[in-house]
Amino acid sequence: MTVVPPPAEGAVALHRRSIDYQAYPDGDDLVVVGHLTASRPWADGTAAVATVHDMELRVKIRTDDLTILGATAVMHTFPHTECPGIESAFAGLVGLSVVRGYTREVQARFGGPRGCTHLEHLARSLGPVVIQAVTSRRALAVSRGESEDLLAGGGGTGSPWARDSCHIWAEGGIADQKLTAGWRPGTGPYPSPALVTFLDRDHSA
């Protein structure tokens, strides 16, 4: 395996792409704001343009089924005068649910010449942000004593949105086994102790 070292100290990047998401409560729903900037750190902003893209995507999500209720795309900085003409197309996100199949549907609707590469990227990456925001809202309720279980609403067997989302949440995998052994997300140390810790505890009980 080839180990890639970090860039040399003081090296100036050729390109910087920054993506940020913020999720806010909106009654029972969520509002997620995605922001993308692309810049050239070597440029002085005079002889050469420093910021080449600055774009924003705002969506409203119904938390019951993770369906998009509203979507607004805004281009603040763009390379062609005509670029903002595609902003309104992203209202086509409305009605989609950010569960399995969402990424494929976004690519089908907005990929390539049907959309904007950068706004499509913001839209495509929404899924994990929404899932984490829902989990964070539950964690907030636990921290306030309003709930005892981070999985409230998930049937007590794990978030249906987390299932098969990664190697930890594979069906029958590490998270499932920890849940069976009594672990509840949002409780105890962070990160969660290794699975063997829970299994040993189970055997000694």
Locations of the language-model features?
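N-terminal intrinsically disordered, cationic/polar leader segments
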Residues: P7-G10, L14-D44, V52-D54
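Active-site- and interface-proximal helix/loop "cap" or "latch" segments in soluble metabolic
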Residues: L36-A205
